């Protein structure tokens, strides 16, 4: 009966979460760098969950946090201990160890970096607390129950395949690209970089430079300002590995008098596809945006229900994602032998976006 109640409640809250988790950072109820109180055991059948979140560096992260707080609510039979780790790996390890001491039932980790997890995951195992990893990946895959997230390399490959088709349609014969990477060591950075570089190497494109913007608007602006000085007049593509970096890059290019987007001198590509940036695609400011779905929490709740029922969940679960374009000249792309649609952004498409 409890499982049926949880399933019904979760279906309702997912609808509310999808409607409410758009890109503004003001929407997340947790304070920046903050945490929720420790869980308290009261002998009830409430499921206690600890969530060690990366931080609050982007609109995507805000949507991810909001989704978890909506799903793992008291109304749904959960008590959530949430820690914003502020992009501090040591703080994240400490948060997980605190969850162990609190005796939570489950631990969710969105890892800041992929390495250095063996010891603390062993401690989770010894305490009998299942760990579920979301978004970014962890190298010690035998020490957690399930991972839920995106195929970051496929995102990078999709970006490259779209750029190839778009350039061919526009008669662009030479690609000179600048890349603003995400946080160093993050699996999203690694996957998107590897995927795009694979296509760039295959096509003989010139990647002029690739530097980290740390997934932040300030970082994206700083790197792009440097690029505009060092590579003035030499580049025709800018790849930003998340939306916030793209916002910073646009500010830098505006200040430098560089035009971008549809009809501009520079093709601008982003990742994440938060709703405000999908609107920028519709407006032609961003040429293409490759979604990274932040809504892992409902799937994590399903995994927890499976574990509560004594079932074995899948080890890897990929969330559904879409690719968005400002123009309709490239209808489909082929990624790893699979034909995938490019969604031409219209007002109807934008209105349907949940975040």
Predicted regions and their residues:
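Short, low-complexity disordered leader/linker segments with a strong preference
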Residues: 1-48, 74, 122-129, 339-343, ...
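Hinge/cleft segment of the Venus flytrap/periplasmic-binding protein
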Residues: 38-41, 45-47, 180-184, 188, ...
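Hydrophobic alpha-helical segments within soluble ligand-binding/sensing domains
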Residues: 42, 49, 92, 148-175, ...
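Extracytoplasmic "Venus flytrap"
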Residues: 48-75, 80-98, 104, 110-114, ...
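Short, solvent-exposed amphipathic alpha-helices that sit
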Residues: 60-74, 78, 155-162, 187-205, ...
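Short beta-strand elements at the ligand-binding edges of bilobed clamshell
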Residues: 82-84, 139-165, 210, 283-294
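Hydrophobic alpha-helical
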Residues: 97-101, 106-126, 196, 209, ...
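Flexible loop/hinge segments that line or gate small-molecule binding clefts
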Residues: 115-154, 176, 274-282
């Amino acid at each position: 009966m409890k499982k049926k109640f949880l399933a019904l409640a979760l279906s309702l809250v997912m609808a509310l979460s999808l409607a409410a988790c758009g890109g503004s950072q003001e929407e997340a109820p947790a304070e920046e760098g903050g945490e929720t109180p420790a869980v308290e055991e009261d002998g009830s059948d409430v499921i206690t969950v600890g969530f060690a979140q990366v931080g609050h560096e982007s609109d995507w992260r805000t949507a991810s946090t909001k989704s978890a707080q909506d799903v793992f609510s008291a109304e749904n039979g959960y008590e959530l201990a949430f820690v914003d780790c502020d992009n501090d790996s040591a703080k994240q390890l400490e948060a997980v160890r605190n969850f162990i001491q609190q005796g939570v039932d489950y631990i969710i980790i969105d890892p800041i970096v992929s390495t250095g997890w063996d010891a603390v995951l062993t401690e989770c195992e010894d305490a009998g607390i299942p760990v579920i990893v979301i978004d970014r990946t962890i190298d010690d895959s035998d020490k957690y129950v399930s991972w839920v997230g995106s195929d970051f390399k496929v995102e990078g490959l999709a970006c490259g395949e779209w750029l190839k088709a778009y350039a061919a349609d526009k008669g662009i014969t030479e690609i000179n690209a600048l890349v603003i990477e995400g946080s160093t060591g993050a699996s999203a950075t690694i996957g998107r970089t590897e995927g795009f570089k694979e296509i760039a190497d295959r096509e003989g494109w010139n990647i002029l430079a690739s530097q980290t913007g740390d997934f932040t608007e300030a970082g994206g602006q700083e790197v792009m300002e440097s690029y505009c000085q060092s590579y003035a007049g030499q580049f025709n593509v800018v790849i930003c590995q998340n939306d916030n970096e793209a916002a910073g890059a646009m500010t830098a290019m505006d200040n430098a008098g560089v035009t971008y987007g549809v009809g501009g001198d520079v093709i601008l590509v982003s990742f994440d596809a938060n709703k405000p940036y999908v609107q920028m695609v519709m407006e032609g400011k961003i040429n293409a945006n490759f979604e990274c779905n932040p809504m892992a929490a409902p799937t994590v709740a399903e995994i927890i229900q499976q574990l509560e029922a004594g079932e074995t969940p899948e080890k890897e679960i990929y969330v559904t994602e879409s690719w968005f374009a400002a123009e309709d000249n490239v209808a489909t792309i082929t990624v790893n032998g699979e034909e995938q649609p490019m969604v031409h952004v219209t007002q109807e498409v934008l209105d349907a976006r949940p975040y």
